[in-house]
Amino acid sequence: MSPQQEPTAQPPRRHRVVIIGSGFGGLNAAKKLKRADVDIKLIARTTHHLFQPLLYQVATGIISEGEIAPPTRVVLRKQRNVQVLLGNVTHIDLAGQCVVSELLGHTYQTPYDSLIVAAGAGQSYFGNDHFAEFAPGMKSIDDALELRGRILSAFEQAERSSDPERRAKLLTFTVVGAGPTGVEMAGQIAELAEHTLKGAFRHIDSTKARVILLDAAPAVLPPMGAKLGQRAAARLQKLGVEIQLGAMVTDVDRNGITVKDSDGTVRRIESACKVWSAGVSASRLGRDLAEQSRVELDRAGRVQVLPDLSIPGYPNVFVVGDMAAVEGVPGVAQGAIQGAKYVASTIKAELAGANPAEREPFQYFDKGSMATVSRFSAVAKIGPVEFSGFIAWLIWLVLHLAYLIGFKTKITTLLSWTVTFLSTRRGQLTITDQQAFARTRLEQLAELAAEAQGSAASAKVAS
């Protein structure tokens, strides 16, 4: 009888954690699990971690996109329990505990034991998605580069235009939404026109450009209170920004915006360059979760999670960041970071034997909110204390530097800020032809051709 071989014991499989998204929530969850006995797969649509609060500075030429978007796999390269995967998550199979993603026509299935959904949010046009073609939002590097191209291209086209009406339209910049992003964007476009580009053109005067900030609300920066909102508005007006409140946008096209004022008046603003910062809409994955579970969504599509950030019936599935609707937690970076760390700590504790039924609820610590208005001027609210002006700007600068990833990134960003804030010069004003004409390239070229034909006809008649 031949000897029987003893069966070899298979090594126990490690707990599998899948993270969807590489933003503040996804990245911080992965880093918090660095020393945990888990295998992590982080799936994201982009190859970088985006520091979204500074996107407006990419759009206005202050810093480069590389300074706020380090490659995710480079950030996590020393964390051996993480695998970074590029792909667009199309479905979460709750019953089968599997995430389905696609990349260049190929479909992949990634099983999980614990799932952290941190897919973020996109721009909301409140049911008018066709506005996006004419008024890009600011949620990605592509958005910021497109806006930079549109802003600088408007000045370039105005320099070549012989039509006063078209020139006025090109030099009118409209920002929709008077929240932090809108305030920061309007302020930087105004400074770009007033200081950086001053004297750079021969046919136009960049300082004559109009910057309009629109909002349906009755105040600027509503979440920060009336006092700080008024101070921000006063600073913007000093820069020459026209603030129009109680103004609801009803239509957007290539040539401008239609607005309905609070008194019912409907009017038109001719503006070639529009920026949309009026609202956000959570990832469609929230709807995917709702269709398979008892979880409900709010009006913005956010998942109404339980106090432990899990979803009803699935204690191993967590939602954090902009996708999660949690009372008292704003849709800002700190909410995503703190939520992600809480979930990672929960997973580690339960792997060590903690009872899932005894989870402590997530507690958010409000570290304050802030917005820059212009060089050396910002507004900030930390607890009950309010700051404005230079002190608030210093607080803003220090905190944003602290949260940037990597020593080299911090240094290069600080150098870019130093050059811009002390000299008004900006080092990132190069645009490509694709960025300049962006999504409306064919229409813009047709308009230029029509104007050229009109000028030629006029010259022929005159001769």
UniProtKB/Swiss-Prot annotation:
Phenotypic consequence of gene deletion: Deletion mutant is attenuated for growth and virulence in mice. Deletion of the gene alters the NADH/NAD(+) ratio, suggesting that this enzyme has an important function in maintaining the redox status of the cell. Mutant shows growth defects in vitro and is more susceptible to oxidative stress reagents, but not to potential NADH dehydrogenase inhibitors. Was considered as an essential gene in vitro, but later studies show that ndh is not essential individually.
Catalytic activity of the protein: a quinone + NADH + H(+) = a quinol + NAD(+); a menaquinone + NADH + H(+) = a menaquinol + NAD(+); a ubiquinone + NADH + H(+) = a ubiquinol + NAD(+)
Gene3D superfamilies, per database record: 3.50.50.100
EC number in record: 1.6.5.9
Enzyme class: oxidoreductase
GO molecular function: NAD(P)H dehydrogenase (quinone) activity; NADH:ubiquinone reductase (non-electrogenic) activity
GO cellular component: plasma membrane
Example of a GO biological process term: aerobic electron transport chain
Regulation of this protein's activity per its record: Inhibited by phenothiazine analogs. Inhibited by 2-mercapto-quinazolinones. Not inhibited by classic inhibitors of type I NADH dehydrogenase, such as rotenone, piericidin A and pyridaben.
Keyword Transmembrane helix carried by entry: yes
Similarity annotation: Belongs to the NADH dehydrogenase family.
Name of the protein: Type II NADH:quinone oxidoreductase Ndh
Organism expressing this protein natively: Mycobacterium tuberculosis (strain ATCC 25618 / H37Rv)
Gene: ndh
